[in-house]
UniProtKB/Swiss-Prot annotation:
This is Uncharacterized protein YMR082C. The lineage of its organism: Eukaryota, Fungi, Dikarya, Ascomycota, Saccharomycotina.
Length: 118
């Protein structure tokens, strides 16, 4: 599994770049700051490459409020998991990936998978 970290700067047009998020419209109020995204792709293309965008959940707030960028110890842990996963067998890295997806969705992060790689 190859993993690349991507930084998108604020002046990009997010809907133009990425279109729909798995059939759902791109969230309107993605903050106009840096967004850290992770690009995942298996070596043998056993599943298509896609992006995961981590945005912090804001509970009990109006939907039009911007999500904040997660800059917490938890996200750094996720990044370390996948830095280590590069050196593992692909099956182990894929298992680590799905653990990341489930743990992040149970915690305080929204994860926005993108269908296509740019």
């Amino acid at each position: 599994m190859t993993i690349a970290e991507i930084t998108i700067r604020q002046k990009f047009s997010y809907p133009f770049l990425f279109g729909n998020v798995l059939g759902h419209p791109w969230p309107r109020n993605v903050p106009r700051k840096e967004i850290k995204m992770l690009l995942f792709r298996t070596a043998n293309n056993s599943f298509p490459g896609f992006l995961l965008i981590f945005t912090r959940k804001r509970r009990n707030l109006p939907k039009q409020r911007d999500n904040e960028i997660p800059r917490t110890r938890a996200l750094e842990t996720y990044l370390r998991v996948f830095s280590a996963a590069r050196k593992q067998r692909e099956a182990d890295a894929t298992a680590s990936f799905w653990r990341l997806v489930t743990s992040a969705s149970r915690s305080h992060y929204h994860m926005w998978p993108i269908k296509r790689i740019i």
